[in-house]
Every structure is written in C-alpha cells, then in structure tokens.
C-alpha cells in the first residue's frame, strides 16, 4: 500500500478571506496570472505561480501547501480549489519515485523537491479530513515479490479529480484524472485535462508521463480510441507512446493500430453475419445515419464516438416509409405503395431463420404473390432502406461478395421503444418522420461492437486473415505508458530569450562533470541565468548553486572549473569566451559526507540512492518477452538466478496469486535435467 501524506487545512471562512479568484478556463493561459519566463524553467516558474496563491494556514513543518480558487461559473457561482503541495524529498521516508522507474527514467537524479497539483473531489471533505495524497507512486504491480492479484491504482489518488506531480527538474507524472463519470460534480475530464496541460505549458515542464488505464464502462479507452483515431484519448493533448511493455516496441504498436483501424467493413460484416445477425444490423444502421461511406472499422467507431458527443435528445436513425411517396419517381397512389411495402415486410417476416438477410430477388419473388405490378414492387424495393414500416425497420445492404442487395427486418423497439409501445408509426404527415437514437442505445451498440469484434471475437475472427485481430488487440492493450515532451518547443526560446550584448542578462545551458562521483551523477542540462557582465568564476558558482539545490546527490558538489576555459580566465567576462545559448560543462567534485571511521554511516551512505531507479540492489530483468527493465507490470523474482520476469509471461494469470517459490523456465529446466544421486 502506497504511503500517504495528509495535510491539515484551516477553516473555509478563514482561508477564503482576501483570496484572489481566477477563471478556471483561463488559468495559466499566456499572461494569466503572469508571464512566465522560459529561461529558468520549471524551478523558477513554479515559484512565480505560487506568489499568486494563498498559503494554507493549517500547514506546519517543512511541508508547504498553497491553493487557488478557480471559478467555473459566475451564475450560479461555482468554484473549485486547486492545491499545490511542496514535498521536501529529503524528509520523505520514500525518496524514489516509482513512476520514474516504470517510464524508463530510473537514471534521473533524485530531486530535492516534488510539487503535487491536487484538485479534490469535494473541498469540504478536504477541509474536514485533510488533503490526502500518495507520496510513493508504486500503485501496485511492478517488480515486486508480492502475491497480490493484478495491479491496482493508488487508493489515495481516487479521491481527487486531478493529481499531478512534477519534480523540481521539470519531469512529471499525471497520477490521476477523473471527470464527470469518475465522480466530478461540475468539471468534465476534458476541462481538467485542459487545465493540467495549460499548467504544464505555462510552467515550462519538460516531460510528463502517464499510465493510461482509462475506461468507459467496460471498454478500455486506449483500445477504443486507438482503433478509431490511431491514438489514445490523451493523444489529443500530445501524449504519445512512452516505452515498451511486454516487449511491444513502437513499430509493433503502430502496426497493430493500423491493422485494427483499417479493417474493411465489406470483408468484416459477411464473416460476422455467419454468427450474429445483430452485428451486421448495427453496421448497416450507422452506415445509413452517416450519410457517407464508412469503409473501415476505424471509420465506424470514429463516427459513433463523434455522433455520441453531439447527439441531441431527438437524433435520427430511421424514417417513415411514407416519405417515399413524395419522391418525383413515385406515380402510384398512397394506398398501393402502402400495400406493396407491407407485402415486402410480410415476405421478410416469413424468412427462415428469423432476422436473416434475404436477397432482393427472393423478396421480390415472395411479394409478387400479392403485388402484380412489378414496376411498383421494384420502386418500393429501391426506395426501402432504413425505413419504418409498421413495427419494423427495413434494413438494406449490399453483400460485398455477391454484389447483390439484401434485406432484413429489425424490431422498431430497438430504435425507438416508444413507437412500439404506442402501436407503430404516428399517422400524422406524409413527409419523412425521423425517430430518435438515444445515447444509451448508441452506447449499447458500441459496447456490442467492442466486445464481439475486439475484446471477445467470435470464431469467425480468430482464424485465417482475421487471426491477427486478437494479437493486435493484445499489443495495443499492453501499451499503457504515454509521454508528452513539453520541452520541444521551449528549448529554442530558452536559449534565445535574453542574452548577448545589450541585454541585462544572459542564459546559458549548463551541466556538470563530476570527477570523483558515480557515473550516475550526470544531470540534464539546466538553464543558468547570469548578469550580462558576469565573469567565468561567477558562472561556475551559480551553476554549483543551481545543481546543488536541485539534486540530493549533488548537495556537496564543489565546482572547480569550466571545461574549455583556463583557470587564469576566471576573472574574464563570460561574453566573448562562451557563446550565448551554447552548452557549458562545469567540472567539479562531490565532497566527502561521511567519516571514514564511522563504518555504520559509511555503509548507509553507500546504500543511499542518488537516482530514481538505483539503491536497494539493482534488479535484473530478463523476461521471455524481451523486457530488460521494470515497466510497471506485475513481476516475479526467480529464487535461484534472482532474475525478474512478468508473471503473465511465466504463465501466471493476472487473477492468480504468484507462488511463494518461483523458478523461471531456464532454472526449472536446469533443475529437472540435474542428475540424481543414489545413495
């Protein structure tokens, strides 16, 4: 269970007095509440933002908490509160971030601070019980010897609409997000995601990762949206494939999405019709509603998702057949057209088995026993298609194999229950009368497609050319880690924004070369801002200050020199020796922090972790799927070779407990082949 931090807050009346009120939809847009400088990066911008926040009176000790009042609506007044908690990592019992290790950032140095951005579900609950959130984001799963079944989300994050954490160096994680379907009273998931994206952009966050386990009902959104749009739901905000899971690399992931999304409906529907009449009818229904040709499974799912978003209470699916009488080519009376339409329906009702698709010629031959006028019959057959006749909807489609029109009946109650209850189609008017498709009905159709085509495909979709479907679905579902690089468009601005002759400050990209430290002590480049007249010596000491304040492992770092600049040049101005915006390497050493005689402290310091994924003994991951490091999925450790591998790859189902004694396949074979000794 992840350790939690609880922040006690003051009373609502005391906290709200004199606070600023910010517009939710505009918060952290350019210039609101401030213009954030790109040069200093996240570490400087977050301090600027917190200067506009309210410092919570109930917080004591080293942990600090600020809050912002965000106004959703003015009439009626609706306000939510965003909290920002500054966590001192040195004082934390869990310094390492498991999410960094799972996304592949295990080599990142541990920062001195982490900032948690929290949007509680209900402010009143946070005031009464305190602000509770996880400080160790293991979330279950991963390289642990535990025997728990499957993986779980962090329980303390479920109580928040938003929980994001950003390390002081600008790398962060979106831990939790819940919209209206996840318990929010006022704010949708899109609005919360927009807010988080604006905060990250404004504060010049570098890269943000997330684990996508979002669902809509029983449907995995990363699969549903992946097939429909070629990307996850978070893709509209720029989140892309982050790292392999179960050995699924980026090319395989992209190919799986392409295979599923481009599956032709003209090939898929005939195979489905052999096992289920409902699926072809669903496809035909939305093909008729769309008004344009839906060629692939991706086209169909994308249309259904977009239709759901804009579906009014009285959307359309079918039309009263009497509307065909207004067509210019109709030269028959209403009574004769009505008789012909009912004859067609009777012919379809007598089809065996029920609800099967019947060719146009079969319907025509059966109806001719009652309608002698072949011209009238041909007109009705040509015009009927997704029209309501009595208590039935006449569906029509073209068989992609035979190229012949086929007809089928669907009970009108599946389109509009009120029509069936009221005894058929209303009698008023002879123009086209449209009937509604509710969102609940569309969702039922969507779940039906998802279940029988993607999640639990029938036998028709597990062999031959369709055998790739289950494999592609598994690969798409295996990828859960996604990242967004906010630093792409900011690097150029940071290097060129300010600096050079005529500017009061210069910005330099600096990193460190630690001469006596571990190879792990290799921090990323940071922007160091100096006065335009600063000397090389001042550059050296400023770089020392920035890096020692940012990383725990560099607190004792002492700068010796600037690589490429002689020791006799330290008193010279930086401008002229170093180009503005260029990369600068400062060389130095990490001071001794332990007493050589204190053996106990020495062992403790040697075991202390300086990186997010180090310390406590390096784990060796060697899985049959090709994984070589911890990807956050449930793993087990071999009791002989001590190599970790996925429990799923070892044949242990997610619903099963891991065995107390576990042997990998290689060690198991070695034990079996070991010669026996007879005493």
UniProtKB/Swiss-Prot annotation:
The record's InterPro entries line, in alphabetical order, gives: YbeY_CS, Zinc_finger_PHD-type_CS, Znf_FYVE_PHD, Znf_PHD, Znf_PHD-finger, Znf_RING/FYVE/PHD
- PHD-type ZnF: 620-670
Q: Entry's CDD domains?
A: PHD_MMD1_like (cd15556)
What Gene3D superfamilies is this protein classified in? Zinc/RING finger domain, C3HC4 (zinc finger)
What residues form the membrane-spanning segments? none
Entry annotated with the keyword Transcription regulation: yes
Name by which UniProt lists this protein: PHD finger protein PERSISTENT TAPETAL CELL 1
- Organism field: Oryza sativa subsp. japonica (Rice)
